[in-house]
């Protein structure tokens, strides 16, 4: 009887699991090819908080094709989808930088292929900008929560060659977007 109850319990547990939904890359012809100065654009889909479903799409004006969820297909050995809450995406040089806020990292990819180059850990990162071979990213420097004792936020400097954090400066609570003005 114990064996029957154990098997019944195991069967119920396995039957209650939800199927894992994985978004595959999709190519969609949306327009005729265009000869413009802008070759295309990347679109960061943030996904729902807690679902690890941020994705990157690319609209290629030269072919008229829209590439949906290109990161997962370009990186089959990585965890599917990009992470939890895509917050910002920028191009600098031949690299693509995606700030994945709740997953606490900046994903660095090859600009043409979206293949993973490295991941830069940064707690509750928000936005990124660039100047003279350096990336500057904002961070809340603490978990995503309502906490009256939350730490002060910071801005980090990342070398775009080594892809390592080289400096950081505490700036106050919840720094978000940032701009570089007149070489300062």
List where the protein language model places each region.
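Sec-dependent signal peptide recognition
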Residues: 1-7
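C-terminal motif of bacterial Sec signal peptides marking the signal peptidase cleavage site
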Residues: 12-15
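Predominantly soluble domains enriched in secretory-pathway, periplasmic, or organellar proteins
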Residues: 17-184
């Amino acid at each position: 009887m114990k064996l029957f109850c154990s098997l019944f319990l195991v069967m119920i547990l396995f039957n209650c699991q939800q199927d894992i939904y994985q978004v595959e890359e999709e190519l969609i012809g949306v327009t005729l090819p265009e000869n413009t100065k802008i070759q295309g654009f990347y679109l960061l889909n943030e996904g729902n908080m807690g679902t690890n479903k941020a994705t990157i799409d690319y609209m290629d004006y030269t072919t008229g094709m829209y590439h949906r969820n290109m990161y997962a297909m370009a990186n089959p050995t990585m965890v599917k989808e990009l992470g939890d809450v895509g917050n910002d995406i920028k191009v600098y040089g031949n690299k693509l930088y995606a700030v994945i806020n709740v997953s606490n990292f900046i994903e660095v990819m090859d600009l043409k292929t979206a293949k993973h180059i490295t991941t830069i850990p940064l707690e509750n990162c928000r936005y990124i900008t660039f100047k003279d071979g350096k990336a500057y990213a904002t961070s809340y420097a603490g978990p995503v929560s309502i906490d009256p004792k939350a730490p002060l936020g910071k801005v980090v400097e990342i070398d775009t060659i080594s892809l390592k954090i080289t400096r950081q400066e505490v700036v106050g609570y919840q720094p978000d977007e940032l701009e570089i003005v007149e070489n300062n």
